A protein has these predicted regions:
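Zn-dependent metallo-beta-lactamase
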Residues: 1-38
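A short, polar/proline- and glycine-enriched secondary-structure boundary/capping micro-motif
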Residues: 25-27, 52-58, 168-174
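Active-site HxH/HxHxD metal-binding segment of metal-dependent hydrolases
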Residues: 59-123, 238-244
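A glycine-rich beta-to-alpha transition motif near the start of alpha/beta enzyme domains, typified by
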Residues: 1-6, 48-63
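A general structural motif
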Residues: 38-39, 64-67, 90, 154-156, ...
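Metallo-beta-lactamase
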Residues: 4-7, 10-13, 43-49, 97-256
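Glycine-rich phosphate-binding "P-loop"
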Residues: 18-19, 38-51
Length: 257
C-alpha cells in the first residue's frame, strides 16, 4: 500500500504503509491518528512515518507536543513501536501483553490494551471490543485473527486489524473470495479455543458487536481498504460474515460442543 495519510472524517486520519510477505508481496498495514475531544491526539497502532507523512502529523500535533498516547491494539503489530516511541517519546505508550513481552525495554504503561482499564482511560473517545471464544494470542503464532477493535465514537470510524477483512486490491489478491465484501479473517477455525462453547461465544460476540456498533460509518482495515457504510449497514454485514463462517462454527461445535 502507498505510504499516505488520508483524512477519513473530522478528527480521524488513516496512515497506510507497506508490509511485504517474503520481501515481495505488499499486503499493507495501517496506523490512525485521532483527535480527542480536548484537541489533543492519539495514535492507534504504530508505523515508521515517511518524511511527507511525518510533516503532516507534526503540523497537526505541534511537532508531537499534542500527542498524548500511542495505543498498539494488535499484538502482532510490533515492527514500528520502537521508531514511534523514539520519535514521540513524550507520548504514553500502550500495548498488549505480547508487546510488553517482545519489546521489554520500551516504557510501556502498566495498563494493557486487552484490559478493561483501557476503556476507563479512553472510553469517552473510543469503544473497544475483543473477540470472544478465543485467546488474543494463540499458541500457533501464525494465527493473527484476534485484536482489539476500536470505534471512534465521534466519526463512527472503526479501526480494525485482521479480525475483519475487507479487500480492495489488484491481482493476485483480487482472486481471493473475500474481495469486495466484509468478512472475518480466514484463520477463524484455528483461532477458536479448543473447548465447549467457544463457537457460541464467538457468534454471540459478533452479533453483539453488530448491534452495539450499528451506527458505524466506515471500517478501516489493516492490510486492506476502507469500507464506507450505509445507515445501520454494519449489523447486516456482520450477519452476512457470520453466515459465511457457519460451517467453521458448526465443525467446532461438533468436535468440542
Amino acid at each position: 500500500m502507498p505510504e499516505t495519510m488520508t483524512r477519513l472524517a473530522d478528527g480521524f486520519w488513516r496512515i497506510t504503509g507497506e508490509v511485504r510477505v517474503g520481501g515481495v508481496l505488499d499486503i499493507g498495514t495501517q496506523s490512525s491518528l485521532v483527535r480527542l475531544d480536548n484537541g489533543r491526539f492519539v495514535f492507534l497502532d504504530s508505523y515508521t512515518l515517511p518524511a511527507p507523512v511525518r510533516q503532516q502529523v507534526d503540523a497537526l500535533t505541534d511537532e508531537g507536543r499534542k500527542l498524548d498516547a500511542i495505543i498498539n491494539l494488535h499484538p502482532f503489530h510490533t515492527l514500528h513501536c520502537e521508531w514511534m516511541h523514539s520519535t514521540y517519546p513524550d507520548a504514553t505508550l500502550y500495548g498488549t501483553a505480547r508487546h510488553h513481552e517482545k519489546l521489554p525495554d520500551l516504557p510501556w504503561h502498566a495498563t494493557r490494551c486487552e484490559e478493561p482499564a483501557l476503556a476507563d482511560k479512553f472510553g469517552d473517545t473510543f469503544a473497544f471490543s475483543q473477540p470472544k471464544g478465543m485467546p488474543l494470542v494463540c499458541d500457533d503464532e501464525s494465527v493473527h485473527f484476534s485484536s482489539i477493535l476500536a470505534l471512534h465514537r465521534t466519526s463512527g470510524t472503526m479501526h480494525v486489524d485482521d479480525t475483519l477483512v475487507y479487500l480492495d486490491k489488484g491481482f493476485p489478491l483480487s482472486a481471493l473470495p473475500m474481495t469486495g465484501r466484509l468478512s472475518f479473517h480466514p484463520t477463524l477455525d484455528k483461532a477458536l479455543s479448543p473447548k465447549a462453547g467457544a463457537a457460541d461465544e464467538f457468534r454471540d460476540w459478533a452479533i453483539e458487536l453488530g448491534i452495539d456498533w450499528a451506527e458505524a460509518r466506515r471500517v478501516a482495515a489493516a492490510h486492506n481498504a476502507v469500507r464506507e457504510l450505509g445507515e445501520e449497514e454494519f449489523p447486516t454485514l456482520i450477519g452476512g460474515a457470520l453466515g459465511r463462517v457457519k460451517p467453521v462454527l458448526d465443525r467446532h461445535r461438533a468436535e468440542y460442543g
